[in-house]
């Protein structure tokens, strides 16, 4: 009778490699889920004085900061009051107080999205070392007075949850636009028409495209 052999060391090695690969895949996914783009892409910053600055950029949805790269180091734009608009690929961002809103619809009634997510600790008390203070950096110097450097790696014991918010701007005032009731409060005189339009077109306002469709229609109401 043949003696059975058990390759326990090989099995253990296989299980360890599988766990490592799975963890690496999850980590890679987490490292990009809190940025708008999967990697830095070329963008431009239009200053209020008309000057244009160009850099490789992305947007951090946890800290709600515009990130750019200088000499291989990732930094955050500051002095937002001097910035008019940021353009990344075909997308448009405007500074609002201390964060950036992305423009989705431009008109008398404009629609913006606040790209945002929350960082959640899954139970490990160790802190998130996502940023460290540095001195002033001379790149986009007109934009950046005090900056932070960023680590793009998210610790394994943390994960992100979506916290995106939508806003409409009318007469230079921002209003929440995350539900039909919030939108109708901005147009109380057109609430019946808005409600009927949502029903007729079967709009789901959790869907960004449907929300855009509704705000485009709202612009017709205020002509």
Segment roles from a protein language model:
Residues 48-50:
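Glycine-centered tight beta-turn/hairpin loop motif at sheet-sheet or coil-to-beta transitions
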Residues 1-32, 214:
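Bacterial Sec-dependent N-terminal signal peptides
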Residues 53, 57-175:
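Aromatic-patch recognition
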Residues 211-223:
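Short, low-complexity, Pro/Ser/Thr/Gly-rich segments in the mature regions of secreted, periplasmic
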Residues 150-213:
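A short, solvent-exposed beta-edge/loop patch
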């Amino acid at each position: 009778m043949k003696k059975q052999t058990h390759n326990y060391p090989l099995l253990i090695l296989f299980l360890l490699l599988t766990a490592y690969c799975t963890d690496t895949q999850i980590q890679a996914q987490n490292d990009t889920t809190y940025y708008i783009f999967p990697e830095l892409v070329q963008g431009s910053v239009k200053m209020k004085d008309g000057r244009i600055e160009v850099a490789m950029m992305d947007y951090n949805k946890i800290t709600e900061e515009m990130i750019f790269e200088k000499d291989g180091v990732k930094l955050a734009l500051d002095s937002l009051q001097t910035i008019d608009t940021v353009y990344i690929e075909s997308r448009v961002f405007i500074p609002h107080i201390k964060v950036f809103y992305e423009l989705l619809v431009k008109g008398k009634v404009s629609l913006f999205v606040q790209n945002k997510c929350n960082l959640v600790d899954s139970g490990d008390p160790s802190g998130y070392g996502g940023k460290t203070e540095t001195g002033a950096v001379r790149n986009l110097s007109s934009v950046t007075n005090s900056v932070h450097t960023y680590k793009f790696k998210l610790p394994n014991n943390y994960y992100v949850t979506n916290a995106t918010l939508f806003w409409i701007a009318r007469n230079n005032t921002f209003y929440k636009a995350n539900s039909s009731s919030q939108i109708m409060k901005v147009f109380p005189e057109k609430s019946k028409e808005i409600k009927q339009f949502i029903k007729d077109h079967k709009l789901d306002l959790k869907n960004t495209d449907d929300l855009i469709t509704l705000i485009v229609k709202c612009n017709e109401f205020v002509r």
